[in-house]
């Protein structure tokens, strides 16, 4: 019998109770202790979680990258162990199960299971169901200086409790769902690691052949040494308020909006049309280069590049990437690239025919190297399975009525 068939048998005819999130959890907002008070951060032993913890260490966490001192805790009260953190502003929907007493920054809302429901739920079952909550959050945001979740609706989000009149069977069902999803998670992690290693090898191959193709003995190849300003036009994009950007494409928000590190969301109006390159202008990742075709909006944190006649835009993309423009960033708290400085950089420009030849070869490697969507699909599969399997609770119960 398959695992899903077994789960359906376990669920046969059971009732599902749907409870508002605020009835199941105590909600508390995170905060950042004052950075000016050194005693709040010196010799800290209390885990203080940020988005970086999830990005670097996953969704089930028992320690944090940064720690704070006990004197930094408001009212001396920590978030309890085995509670769930979910981001309700900025990068919305990211969540993690925290297995130790802790605190978090203001981007997170802590979901701590109420004592009255402590014996009714498996916290890991609720953690997996938060993938569905996360999707709801991303679709229900309010816009001000930055995106934030509609908290009134958030508190009303419904949580399923299978077989509410039989606590023992309810926990057995939840435990079985968790077991299946744990297996999905393990397989996902294994496959993701394999794919990431494969992509790393492809990247090394691409870099090697790119460097070989873009390195010339100038006396052996037709061409001239020029500055970037001689072969391309560079101009910073235009400022746009954060409240005019939404996360997903919909209705009149049809134009992708690019900042210094890639796409930020979608906007109503375009700033550019055609075939261009975008160079990240500000931030730790400034100097990254992307190709863009069609209609889009570029913010002031991106440099929009248009090539001159006699320059192949795909060759220019690979050349700029190989130049590692990040090395020319200002050494400050907020690294940045000056357009004027970029325009003065020199390089050897071969004939247009050789540019096209080089670009065609490197594009093939680039396609192989950047199969990141494959990894992204694998990483998101567990989230989809979490929602799909848990929703069997609802579907099976309805089919038996």
Curated annotation (Swiss-Prot):
Give coiled-coil spans as residue ranges.
Answer: none
Q: Which GO terms describe its molecular function?
A: DNA binding
What domain of life does the UniProt record list for this protein's source? Bacteria
Print the keywords alphabetically.
DNA-binding, Restriction system
Concerning CDD domains, the annotation shows: RMtype1_S_HpyAXIII_TRD1-CR1_like, RMtype1_S_Sau1132ORF3780P-TRD2-CR2_like
Biological process, per Gene Ontology: DNA restriction-modification system
Q: According to its UniProt entry, what is the function of this protein?
A: The specificity (S) subunit of a type I restriction enzyme; this subunit dictates DNA sequence specificity. The M and S subunits together form a methyltransferase (MTase) that methylates two adenine residues of the sequence 5'-CCAN(7)ATGC-3'. In the presence of the R subunit the complex can also act as an endonuclease, binding to the same target sequence but cutting the DNA some distance from this site. Whether the DNA is cut or modified depends on the methylation state of the target sequence. When the target site is unmodified, the DNA is cut.
Q: What is known of its domains?
A: Contains two DNA recognition domains, each specifying recognition of one of the two defined components of the target sequence.
Per the record, the similarity remark reads:
Belongs to the type-I restriction system S methylase family.
Q: How does it assemble?
A: The type I restriction/modification system is composed of three polypeptides R, M and S; the restriction enzyme has stoichiometry R(2)M(2)S(1) while the methyltransferase is M(2)S(1).
This protein's name: Type I restriction enzyme EcoprrI specificity subunit
């Amino acid at each position: 019998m398959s695992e899903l068939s077994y789960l359906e048998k376990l669920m046969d005819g059971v009732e599902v109770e749907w409870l508002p999130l605020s009835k199941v959890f105590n909600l508390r907002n995170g905060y950042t202790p004052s950075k000016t008070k050194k005693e709040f951060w010196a010799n800290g032993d209390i885990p203080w979680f940020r988005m970086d913890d999830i990005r670097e260490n996953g969704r089930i966490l028992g320690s944090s990258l940064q720690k704070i001192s006990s004197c930094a805790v408001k009212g001396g009260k920590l978030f309890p162990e085995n509670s769930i953190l979910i981001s309700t502003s900025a990068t919305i929907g990211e969540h993690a199960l925290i297995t130790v007493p802790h605190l978090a920054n203001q981007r997170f809302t802590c979901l701590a299971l109420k004592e009255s429901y402590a014996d009714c739920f498996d916290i890991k079952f609720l953690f997996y169901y938060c993938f569905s909550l996360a999707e709801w959050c991303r679709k229900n945001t309010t816009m001000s200086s930055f995106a934030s979740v509609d908290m009134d609706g958030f508190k009303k989000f419904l949580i399923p409790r299978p077989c509410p009149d039989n606590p023992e069977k309810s926990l057995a069902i939840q435990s079985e769902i968790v077991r299946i999803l744990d297996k999905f998670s393990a397989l996902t992690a294994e496959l993701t690691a394999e794919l990431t290693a494969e992509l790393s090898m492809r990247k090394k191959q691409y870099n090697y052949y790119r460097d070989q193709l873009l390195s010339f003995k100038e006396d052996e190849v037709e061409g001239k040494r020029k500055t970037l300003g001689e072969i391309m036009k560079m101009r910073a994009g235009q400022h746009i308020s954060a409240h005019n950007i939404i996360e997903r494409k919909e209705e009149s928000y049809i134009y992708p909006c690019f900042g210094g590190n890639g796409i930020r969301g979608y906007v109503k109006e375009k700033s550019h049309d055609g075939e261009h390159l975008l160079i990240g202008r500000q931030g730790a990742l400034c100097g990254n280069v992307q190709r863009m075709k069609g209609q889009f909006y570029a913010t002031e944190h991106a440099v929009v590049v248009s090539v001159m006649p006699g320059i192949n835009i795909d060759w220019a993309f690979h050349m700029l990437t190989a130049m590692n423009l990040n090395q020319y960033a200002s050494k400050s708290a907020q690294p940045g690239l000056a357009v004027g400085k970029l325009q003065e950089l020199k390089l050897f420009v071969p004939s247009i025919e050789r540019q096209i030849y080089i670009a065609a070869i490197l594009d093939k490697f680039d396609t192989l190297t950047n199969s990141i969507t494959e990894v992204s699909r694998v990483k998101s599969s567990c989230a989809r399975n979490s929602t799909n399997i848990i929703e069997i609770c609802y579907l099976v119960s309805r089919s038996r009525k």
